[in-house]
Amino acid sequence: MHLSSRANAPAPHKPYNPFYLQLYFWVIIAIILGALLGHCYPVVGQQLKPLGDAFIKLVKMIISPVIFLTIVTGIASVAHVGTVARVFGKAMVYFLFFSTLALLLGLVVAHVVHPGVGMNINPADLHQGEIASYVEKSHDLTLVGFLMDIIPKTLLSPFVGDNILQVLFVAVLFGIALALAGERGKPVLNLLDALTLPVFKLVQMLMKMAPIGAFGAIAFTIGKYGVDSLVNLGWLVGSFYLTSLLFVLVILGAVSWFSGFSILKLIRYLKSELLLVLGTSSSEAALPSLMEKMVQAGCKKSVVGLVVPTGYSFNLDGTNIYMTLAALFIAQATNTELTPAHQLALFLVAMLSSKGAAGVSGAGFITLAATLTVVPEVPIAGMALILGVDRFMSECRSLTNFIGNAVATLVVSRWENALNHEQLKIALDGSEPAYQSLHAKDAEPSVSR
């Protein structure tokens, strides 16, 4: 009788919060006000850049502890090294497949839409001074250099830098070592597990400053580049936005449907984070919040800790679409004939160079420069054509990358039987709060067959 009454007891309901008290509402207001200020008073808008930069720096300050604590406690609690390798392998298969689809989609759309045809630009007439710094940075993006850079100089150096993969590398090794230590490692695991609570309280505190950061960042973008630059290259920008939307709704929508959840409900669930990414033009700004929300949606902490940080370097769907679409736009605008062999070379180089792109604003432009440097058939001077609108495309790149990593985390969790489907439904429907958090122990998932 006691069990029956408990089973029939109504579930606790989330207290109603008016929309004007929720974070996403104030981020929207901040973006609108920032855009208006940047348009009406461009000089003032440009001077507000430190607000956006300061918020990004505050978030990046907490990213390393979040990743380290999540991965170490997740792996050490699993206590099976083979599980870690299996999750990582499944994630890399997913990343490779959908990154390839994104690159192919960019190529196909460029051939169908022809965004650069008819511009008849002579590369010799383009001013290359503004892109020189991007080209110089792109020379450092080599495969060997990228792999070697994953290994930090010391055990502590990843925590004073901004290389997510170095933090991931150290965290995985430390988590495995802690798991192998057995009972003697329990005190350390308990300490790290306890530390996650104040760290994520700090994340919640920083997220309350998101409207200020979004306001400053969007005011700077509109003030510096203006909306006029969008008119001149509107066909390219529009093609990129529509292609990214197609990728999210059709391709990611299909894999979401097959995995048992709705892409539209997922987007609604992550609306605050997506608005933050839109305002700051950086998917990295919402990384800590994404990790916590994926656990709240029913993913095991150990899977989230491995998939999300790795995806920020290896699963950049928006950047991949941008690279092939922008490269063919430059070729079309400069009347450069690309044979199928040239396009295959471009595709293969883009597959490699995109894996080192960071989750910060402007990284996609540097990656494009690295790709065109290796494929000389496309004049790198043509990058000057899109420099003025790259910031506007950067926002779409970041949004697509962010959604892609959220979907990847849910899909890999499902493959691993590490997804609580009841908790996912509650989170995506928004009917009740998801009580589990990153500082909670992993619960047994409820997996639908």
UniProtKB/Swiss-Prot annotation:
PROSITE patterns: NA_DICARBOXYL_SYMP_1, NA_DICARBOXYL_SYMP_2. GO terms for cellular component: plasma membrane. Keywords: Cell inner membrane, Cell membrane, Membrane, Symport, Transmembrane, Transmembrane helix, Transport. It is found in: Cell inner membrane. It is a multi-pass membrane protein. Pfam families: SDF. Belongs to the dicarboxylate/amino acid:cation symporter (DAACS) (TC 2.A.23) family. This is C4-dicarboxylate transport protein. Gene3D superfamilies: Sodium:dicarboxylate symporter. One of its GO terms (biological process) is L-aspartate transmembrane transport. It comes from Xylella fastidiosa (strain 9a5c). It comes from the Bacteria. The keyword Hydrolase does not apply. The chain crosses the membrane at residues 20-42, 62-84, 91-113, 164-181, 202-224, 239-261, 344-366, 370-389. Its main location: membrane. One of its GO terms (molecular function) is malate:proton symporter activity. Responsible for the transport of dicarboxylates such as succinate, fumarate, and malate from the periplasm across the inner membrane. The gene is dctA. InterPro entries: C4_dicarb_transport (IPR023954), Na-dicarboxylate_symporter (IPR001991), Na-dicarboxylate_symporter_CS (IPR018107), Na:dicarbo_symporter_sf (IPR036458).
